[in-house]
A protein has these predicted regions:
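Tandem repeat scaffolds
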Residues: 1-186
Length: 186
């Protein structure tokens, strides 16, 4: 069903998929770039090496999906919830995330470099060995998440509360300036 909707949105030249639910879909190496997903729900879907670059996700719910190793570079996310899902190795570089909620999900080895986050929340997620270089974070709440081995080079962590998060082995600059003003438990 999703491939048909994708073809229809491309042929109509508006690149929009709205007010739909997709369940148990499997896509491999598909081009979903520059598509606008509005008021869409994905559940138990699997995307393998799909290209979502420059796509927009507006009022979207993602539950129990796997989008590992997909390309979401330069994508835009607003009022999106991702729950019980996997995005291991996915590329979210240069993305903009506003009111994004991530729960009970894994993003190990994912690339968030040069992305922007605002009014978003992360709860019980794994970001092991992920890349957060040169990221702008504004009003991000963190709870019970794992950032072991993550790279925060040139990403100010001021005002972020990592108190109940695991942050062993993270990478920052030689001056440790990224760590100024962050909260942790010792």
């Amino acid at each position: 069903m999703l491939t048909q909707q994708l073809a229809a949105s491309r042929s109509e030249d508006d690149g929009r998929i709205s007010d739909m639910s997709f369940h148990d879909e499997t896509l491999n190496n598909e081009d979903l770039s520059k598509i606008i997903f509005h008021n869409v729900q994905f559940s138990k879907c699997r995307f393998t090496r799909c290209d979502f670059s420059q796509s927009r996700f507006l009022s979207v719910a993602v539950k129990n999906c796997d989008f590992s190793n997909c390309n979401f570079s330069e994508s835009f996310w607003k009022q999106v919830t991702i729950t019980d899902s996997r995005g291991n190795g996915a590329d979210f570089s240069q993305s903009c995330c506003k009111e994004l909620t991530l729960c009970d999900s894994s993003f190990a080895y994912a690339n968030f470099s040069k992305s922007q986050w605002e009014n978003s929340g992360v709860s019980n997620c794994s970001f092991k060995e992920s890349f957060w270089a040169e990221v702008r974070l504004k009003k991000l709440t963190l709870a019970a998440s794992v950032f072991s081995g993550a790279d925060f080079f040139k990403t100010p962590l001021k005002d972020l509360d990592f108190s109940d998060c695991k942050i062993d082995g993270i990478t920052v600059s030689e001056t440790f300036k990224e760590l100024r003003g962050m909260q942790i438990n010792l």
